[in-house]
Each structure stands twice: as structure tokens, then as C-alpha cells.
């Protein structure tokens, strides 16, 4: 989730603690490709993929290499399609799901402000790093960083309760509206469906 970004940037003012939620609120849709780097116990795993999300709670994440997995949500259920296992898991949305990094892109602003607080935004040269903390002590998410270059979002990095550090480097970012059909999961024939 880094490099060449298509910008609908914050106007020519500097991102800071006071205007970050306004910036996020102005972004109703996101489409991007990404490279996800997960670090745990000094080991690194790299996965490529794409993401589409909107503020109505809907999203679709397609992992391409080395995983072949799709995770999507229609705002009511979370769907996890594992092509290798030929299995679709359907999980109802629960409150625990709200404290995950995808919430930054899918929740309405009033809900986002209830769940998270902006700890700081620090700018060095052309990079701004905003630190976001969950309000709940029971959150899976410990700390989240939004990284901007010249006011364009380039990376989402977080640390979780499993001692993992995950960095989503965004590229080919597009903030333009898209149809819900683009994030609807189509279920291949012969897939086992598991309800949780």
C-alpha cells in the first residue's frame, strides 16, 4: 500500500490531530492494490493483494500471492473464501470486529470516534505519521499508524495483540465511488459453506 498514489489529497494544509478524522470522513470509498508485510518473531511474510472499501461497512480484500483468499463484508456478515481449501466461512458481524484496522476505512465517523482516538500526528520532511489508539483495552488492535506522503495515504501499519506488526503498503489508490457489485463476493460452485 505505498508508492504511486492517485490523490484526492487533503488541500494544501498539513494533516494533524485536529483534522485527521475530517480527512478520513471525506474519503467515502477506497480502491487500492497493496503489499502486506507481516512481522512476527523476527520472521517476515509478504502477501500482495487488492482492497475496496466504503463507509457503509462494506469491503472486499483479495489476497493474490502467495495466498488465494478473499475476505469481504456486506456490512452484516464477514465472508472468508479460501480457494485452496474450497471453503467459504460466513461469520456474523460482531462488536469485536469493529476494533480491527479495516474499521478505519469502513465505519461512519461517529462510530470511528467512539472506537478510536488520535494520539498524535508527526511530520518529518514530506511524511506524516498519525498514531491511532483503540479506546477499548480489550481490542485486538494495539496501535495503528496512518502514513502519508504529501498528504496522500501511502501505508497503514498496525500492531496487534498477537505481537504481530502488519504493514499494508498501498499503491494505485483511487478514492472514487464504485458500485456495490464490485465488492460482492461470487461463490464458485462446489465450495463448502460453513456458518459460524
For each feature predicted by the language model, list its residue ranges:
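Short, charged/polar low-complexity linear motifs in solvent-exposed/disordered segments
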Residues: 49, 78-80, 88-89, 97-99, ...
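Gly/Pro-enriched, hydrophobic low-complexity segments
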Residues: 111-196
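Hydrophobic h-region of N-terminal signal peptides that target proteins for export
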Residues: 2-11
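An acidic-aromatic
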Residues: 50-100, 166-167
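N-terminal mature ectodomain segment of secretory-pathway/periplasmic proteins
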Residues: 16-19, 25-75
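Short hydrophobic/aromatic-rich beta-strand segments that constitute the beta-sheet cores
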Residues: 32-34, 59-63, 78-81, 132, ...
Amino acid at each position: 500500500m505505498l508508492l504511486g498514489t492517485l490523490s484526492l489529497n487533503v488541500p494544501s494544509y498539513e494533516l494533524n490531530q485536529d483534522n485527521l478524522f475530517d480527512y478520513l470522513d471525506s474519503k467515502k470509498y477506497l480502491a487500492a492494490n497493496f503489499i502486506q508485510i507481516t512481522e512476527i518473531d523476527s520472521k517476515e511474510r509478504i502477501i500482495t493483494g487488492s482492497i475496496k472499501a466504503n463507509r457503509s461497512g462494506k469491503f472486499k480484500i483479495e489476497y493474490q500471492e502467495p495466498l488465494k483468499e478473499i475476505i469481504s463484508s456486506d456490512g452484516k456478515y464477514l465472508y472468508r473464501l479460501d480457494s485452496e481449501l474450497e471453503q467459504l466461512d460466513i461469520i456474523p458481524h460482531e462488536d469485536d470486529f469493529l476494533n480491527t484496522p479495516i474499521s478505519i476505512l469502513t465505519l461512519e465517523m461517529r462510530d470511528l470516534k467512539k472506537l478510536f482516538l488520535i494520539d498524535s500526528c508527526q511530520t518529518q520532511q514530506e511524511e506524516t505519521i498519525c498514531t491511532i489508539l483503540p479506546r477499548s483495552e480489550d481490542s485486538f488492535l494495539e496501535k495503528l499508524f496512518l502514513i502519508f506522503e504529501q498528504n496522500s495515504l501511502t501505508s497503514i501499519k498496525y500492531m496487534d495483540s498477537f505481537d504481530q506488526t502488519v504493514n499494508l503498503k498501498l499503491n494505485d489508490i483511487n478514492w472514487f465511488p464504485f458500485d456495490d457489485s464490485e465488492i460482492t463476493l461470487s461463490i464458485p460452485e462446489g465450495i463448502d459453506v460453513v456458518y459460524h
